[in-house]
Amino acid sequence: MCIRDSIYAASDGPSLTRELEYALSLGAPARLVKPEGLPFPVREALCFERQAQLSPLPFLAALLPELTVYEHSPVRDIRGHRVRCDGGTVTAEQIVVATHFPMLERFGLYDLRLRQERSYLLALTGAPPLPGMWLDAGEEGWSLRRSGRYLLLGGGGHRCGENLGDSYDRLRAQAQRLFPAAQEAFAWSSQDCMTLDGVPYIGPYSSSAPFLHVATGFGKWGMTGSMVAATLLTARLTGENYPYADIFSPQRFFPSASISAFWEGAGYAVRGIGRRLFVPAQTAAADIARGHGGIVAWQGKKYGVYRHTDGTLFAVDIRCPHRGCELTWNDDEKSWDCPCHGSRFDYTGHRLSEPAKAALKPCKDFPQEI
C-alpha cells in the first residue's frame, strides 16, 4: 500500500465547485487544483489528499494465514441455516453472501435491482510518471494510476451485453493520444454490479431472512466498498451499532434515485425476451467470418454461432439459462453476454460469470463447416 493524492479531473463540462462543496461538508480533505505539466489537458481538478492506493493481492495474502479457505466447494443452495456445497452441507447461525451477484433468487429481487457493467484496462510501459491517482470526470470515465513500472489506463465501460466490438480499440486509441511513446504490456477487462441509486447493498439479504447478509453492488469501487462491507457486517454480526447502516441497507428505497433505473432494468429484461421470441435472426452462418460470431436461424430455432480461426463452427442455444433473455455476441472477448442481468458464456457455452448457474446447451447437430 502507498499514500497518494486521488484526483478527479475535468477537461471540459461543468465546474467541480459543487463537488468540492459537498466533499468539504463531509469533512473530506479536498481542494480544487489546476495541474500543469501533464500529457493531457485539465481545466481543473478536485484533489483528495493522502489517499491509500491498495494492491489487493498482497492484502489478501496477508489475510490468508488467519482464514480457512475451502477451494473447489461451490455453494449450490442455502436453505435456512444450511449451506449446501458439492462436498457436503455446512450449518451456520449467520451467513454472508458475498458472491459478486447475489446467488439466492428467492429473496430480495436482486436481479431487478442490479445491472452489470464491463470496463477495460491496459497496462502500459514507457509512459511518463504521473503523480497520484486520476479519474476523468467525463462520460468515458478514464482512470490512470501507477502500479510498479506500469501505468494502468482504464475506461470504456458499458452495460454487459452492449459491446460494440471496439472497446479495446478505443482504449488503445486513448493511450496513443495521451502517451504516444508507451507500449502495451497487458490488456484485460472486469465486470461490476451496479445498484439502482449508485450506493452498494450491504446488510440484511431480505427482511424475511434476518440470518442472511449480503454485500454487493460496489459499482467499480470494489476495494473501497469491500472495506465498508467488512466494517458494517462485522458490526452487524457482533451486535454493535454502525452509524451509516441505513444508507447501505438493501431494504432502502429512494424513489427519486431508484424508480427510473428500476424501470430501465425491467425494460432490458422485456426487450431481451421479446427479441428472442419475435425478432428473426439476421445473419447466415456462411457470412460469419473467422474469429467472429452471430445469431443464426437453423431448423426453426435461433442459435449463437461462432466461427473459430480454423474455420470450425460452434453453435449454442442463444437463450440465457437465467431468465431466458437473448444473448448478444461480444466480439472483443469472444463471448456470449446477457444484456438483461449480465451472465456471460464462452463460445462453447461454458459459463463465465453469474447470475446464470448453468452452461449454454450446445447444438451438436449444427454443421461444423458451412
Regions found by a protein language model. Name each.
Residues 33-38, 71-84:
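A conserved short coil-to-beta-strand element within the FAD-binding core of flavoproteins
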Residues 78-146, 272, 276, 280-286:
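Flavin-dependent oxidoreductases
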Residues 185-193, 211-214, 272-319:
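A glycine-rich dinucleotide-binding beta-alpha-beta segment and adjacent secondary-structure elements
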Residues 122, 292-369:
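Rieske [2Fe-2S] iron-sulfur-binding domain
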Residues 10, 73, 85-86, 92, ...:
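Short, well-ordered coil/turn residues at beta-beta hairpins
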Residues 60-61, 65, 93, 98, ...:
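Active-site-proximal alpha-helical segments within enzyme catalytic domains
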Residues 22, 50, 138-139, 148, ...:
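C-terminal catalytic lobe of FAD-dependent flavoproteins
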Residues 4-62:
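Rossmann-like flavin
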